[in-house]
């Protein structure tokens, strides 16, 4: 719980992606198709730079993306050198109806390798809704992506197809590469059965679970879940309990066992510095 007055972040991770490609391949269309956030040219940024933020959900975590479009400017080298600082991913965009834009990807890759070597990349074929004008076969683009060792998508901003999926996959690649996925591995998503067991056990004493109007198998599962939860809680508080058989009541019962702890202070007859470890 955050302290009073401290802002609550609306995301768990913040990533910066660059969209690169020739002019008129539809990078602005991709940004405009994203729902939250508005495409903008922020004050103080050079003309030809469009910026947009959006938040995606990745394995139960909120990932905020800062998306920058260089708009294929001829002075890309200078722009990329400035805006590649801190960029964690690059989206290579071409138009499937424009062969020249696909052939130009090699030039962009050389610039990226020079100014941001090793940054994760994906290849995106834009304007899938213009498939009837296709000039770049899907198989050829897929083979090219495999040679580069990058993931390949064909997207359509008009149909809102594969837009979020492509950004989500790039975010996953970036987080895996930096090992940030380990931060949320312990917080698994609970199953519906475990949630129901927790709800029942939290409001029902353990000795009353047998009296619930439930099937025998379910009562047995709830009882074992209650015993495990109670044992873990008591062990955390420094107590130990053992399960023993009580012949008079013909049922299992808990018996408290005192835990012998090592002395926390030296004996009274032990002088300071008189005990040495050889």
Curated annotation (Swiss-Prot):
Cofactors demanded by this protein: Mg(2+)
Bias (Basic residues) ranges: 248-259
Pathway listed: Protein modification; protein ubiquitination
Keywords: Cell membrane, Cell projection, Cytoplasm, GTP-binding, Hydrolase, Lipoprotein, Magnesium, Membrane, Metal-binding, Nucleotide-binding, Palmitate, Prenylation, Ubl conjugation pathway
Lipidation (S-palmitoyl cysteine): 270
Region span, Switch-II: 72-88
Protein known as: Ras-related protein Rab-40B
Gene for this chain: Rab40b
């Amino acid at each position: 719980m955050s302290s009073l007055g401290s802002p609550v972040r609306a995301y768990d991770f913040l990533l910066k992606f660059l969209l690169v490609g020739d002019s008129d391949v539809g990078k602005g269309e991709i940004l405009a198709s994203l729902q939250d956030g508005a495409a903008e040219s922020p004050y103080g940024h050079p003309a030809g730079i469009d910026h947009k933020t959006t938040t995606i959900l990745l394995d139960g975590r909120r990932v905020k993306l800062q998306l920058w479009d260089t708009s294929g400017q001829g002075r890309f080298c200078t722009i990329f050198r400035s805006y590649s600082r801190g960029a964690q991913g690059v989206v290579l965009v071409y138009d499937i109806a424009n062969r020249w834009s696909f052939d130009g990807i090699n030039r962009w890759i050389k610039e990226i390798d020079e100014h941001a070597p090793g940054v994760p990349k994906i290849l995106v074929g834009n304007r899938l809704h213009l498939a009837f004008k296709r000039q770049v076969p899907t198989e050829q683009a897929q083979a090219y992506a495999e040679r580069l060792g990058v993931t390949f998508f064909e997207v359509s901003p008009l149909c809102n197809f594969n837009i979020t999926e492509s950004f989500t996959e790039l975010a996953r690649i970036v987080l895996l590469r930096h090992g940030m996925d380990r931060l949320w591995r312990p917080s698994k998503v609970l199953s519906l059965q475990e949630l129901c067991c927790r709800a029942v056990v939290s409001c029902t004493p353990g000795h009353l679970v047998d009296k619930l109007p439930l099937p025998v198998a379910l009562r047995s599962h709830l009882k074992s879940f209650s015993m495990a939860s109670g044992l873990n809680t008591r062990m955390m508080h420094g107590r130990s309990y053992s399960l023993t058989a009580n012949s008079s009541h013909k049922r299992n019962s808990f018996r408290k066992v005192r835990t012998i702890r090592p002395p926390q202070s030296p004996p009274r007859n032990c002088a300071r510095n008189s005990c040495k470890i050889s």
